[in-house]
Amino acid sequence: MSGHSKWATIKRKKDAIDSKRGAIFTRVGKEITVAAKMGGGDPEGNPRLRLAILKAKSVNMPKDNIERAIKKGTGELEGVVYEECLYECFGPAGIAIMVSAVTDKKSRTTPEIKSILTKLGGSLATSGSVSRLFEKKGVIVLESSQIGEDKLVDLAVGEGAEDVINEGEVYRVITTPDDYESVLHALNEKGLKSEESEIRYIALISSEIADKEVAKKVMKLIEQLDGHDDVTSVTSNFELAASLEKEFE
């Protein structure tokens, strides 16, 4: 599970600069619309929609926005037709990157993702060549000021979490996809608020970067991919070498 603290930092900085919460709501809204289109508008009978709604609530998305996104998916409201895309990529120094996107026009999104990769030393990979290096996990990020580590471990692991990682300012709770919902619910019941929560790809093996210039390029690539309007998540197996950590604080 190592190598993700720097990515968490990048993401928090991006979300702060991004402070257009509307951009976050748009991303989550697309996920809700796709989930409702695929499995119907009733979250009780549509686990994927239920999880998308949980994610929306974790970023304080207004109830009206959630309901509109559902209705667009079910056809009750007119809206754009979205489809999911998963891009398997290689970055500088051969790092592996998984990019998830939701788009209304794949023929536009794919060349744009490819262009970002090409400009920063990356490339699209063949199907299966990168995804085999990752697995899907539930990831719940909490500010550490809310609860002590021992208490969180007892609570989260007691509900089925696999791991709790202390990253200083935040804790990262890792679950299986099946246990994600129950763990998140248990944390919410205790009044704990998550900075982010989702089921996403996690690297099985990390790739350490010790060269400062390569590290800069990798981080810029990840930020630009994550900044694309259609991208919903970016995960890489990039890990910053200990010798460079102070350089990027």
Curated annotation (Swiss-Prot):
InterPro entries: Integrase-like_N, TACO1_YebC-like_2nd/3rd_dom, TACO1_YebC_N, Transcrip_reg_TACO1-like, Transcrip_reg_TACO1-like_dom3, YebC-like. GO terms for biological process: regulation of DNA-templated transcription. SUPFAM superfamilies: YebC-like (SSF75625). One of its GO terms (molecular function) is DNA binding. The keyword Cytoplasm applies. The keyword Metal-binding does not apply. One of its GO terms (cellular component) is cytosol. Pfam families: TACO1_YebC_N, Transcrip_reg. Keywords: Cytoplasm, DNA-binding, Transcription, Transcription regulation. HAMAP family: Transcrip_reg_TACO1 (MF_00693). This is Probable transcriptional regulatory protein LBL_2537. It comes from Leptospira borgpetersenii serovar Hardjo-bovis (strain L550).
